[in-house]
Amino acid sequence: MGWETVLRGIEDALASDLGRAEKAVQIAELVRQAGSYRWVGLYAVTDQEIIAIGWTARPGAPAHPRFPVTQGLSGAAVATGRAVVVNDVTADPRYLTAFASTLSEVIVPVVDPGTGTVVGTLDVESAERDAFTDADRQALVGCAAVLWGLFAAAGS
């Protein structure tokens, strides 16, 4: 599945009558399949916390479904407003272990286009080192730009 198909799928999910969590799960699965990634999750960001709202079924719920906004790779993405790509999480002290099998991770902030505030994150994980290329990062940043609608609808 190509990234244009994924973007259309995200837009379709956002326009559907599904609830926010159901939309997040559907979108996470679309992204996971497009890049052959092992796990994808979507998180809401508040002033204090990062909170999981939906993820792919396998390997399951994240070990940290909510954590302080200043922690982990997600905290770094929120603080900078930029994607964080780590191709060996065992070498990065910011990494919060969600799954023992994760070796590479990308966190992409979802930004409110009106205020520039980070309102969510797209978390993509792989069981392989060096799994993410710049093309992956660019595609995921494109997905995050469309994802704003998931958070706008919730009043985030």
Regions found by a protein language model. Name each.
Residues 39, 107, 121:
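Short hydrophobic/aromatic beta-strand element in the GNAT-like acyltransferase core
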Residues 104-114:
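A short, aliphatic-rich beta-strand micro-motif
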Residues 34, 97-103:
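Short loop/turn motifs at secondary-structure junctions and domain boundaries
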Residues 44-98:
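Regulatory sensory and allosteric helical modules in signal-transduction proteins
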Residues 3-7, 11, 120, 125-156:
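Juxtadomain coupling helices with adjacent low-complexity linkers
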Residues 16-53:
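Helix-loop-beta substructure at the N-terminus of cytosolic sensory domains
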Residues 9-17, 25-34, 76, 146, ...:
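Amphipathic alpha-helical regulatory segments at dimerization interfaces
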